[in-house]
Regions:
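ATP-binding/phosphotransfer module of carbohydrate and carboxylate kinases, centering on a glycine-rich
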Residues: 5-134
Length: 134
């Protein structure tokens, strides 16, 4: 799924060959690439999250911007399908900042005045996708 933007988060080609794919900026590797682009520090997503948890202003600002992009992507699903819940998976879904802040950000991008879709953390950790495919 693409989210065509002309801003600083739309710099990297996706492995599928397109530009603007959600994977290129919402995945852990995408998050790390964008952090490097902005701050010239090569940190993985887990370290960026730890820095934010420890009050690092640069990491906090970056995570806040990341959450805005996550909200844009989730809003596309909500606007089209209107699911009762969306369960997030993968390593980045372990970011505690997501679950406390995403609903206020979603309100900027959904068509409705309210957001009734629950954004949930998976129950089985990073192996949730594998379990779901089984």
């Amino acid at each position: 799924m693409t989210y065509g933007t002309n801003d600083k988060w739309n710099r990297h080609d996706c492995y599928c060959g397109k530009k603007g794919c959600i994977e290129t900026y919402l995945s852990g590797p995408g998050l790390s690439k964008h952090y490097y682009d902005l701050h010239k520090k090569n940190l993985d997503a887990k370290i960026i999250q730890e820095n934010a948890n420890n009050g690092d202003d640069q990491a906090l600002e970056f995570i806040n911007e990341y959450l805005d992009y996550l909200a844009r992507g989730l809003a596309q699903v909500i606007n089209i399908i209107d699911p009762g819940a969306i369960v997030l998976g993968g390593g980045v879904s372990n970011m505690k900042q997501i679950y406390g802040n995403i609903n206020s950000k979603l309100k900027k991008y959904v068509f409705s005045d309210t957001v009734n879709t629950q954004i949930l953390k998976n129950k089985f950790g990073d192996s949730s996708g594998v379990r779901g495919a089984a």
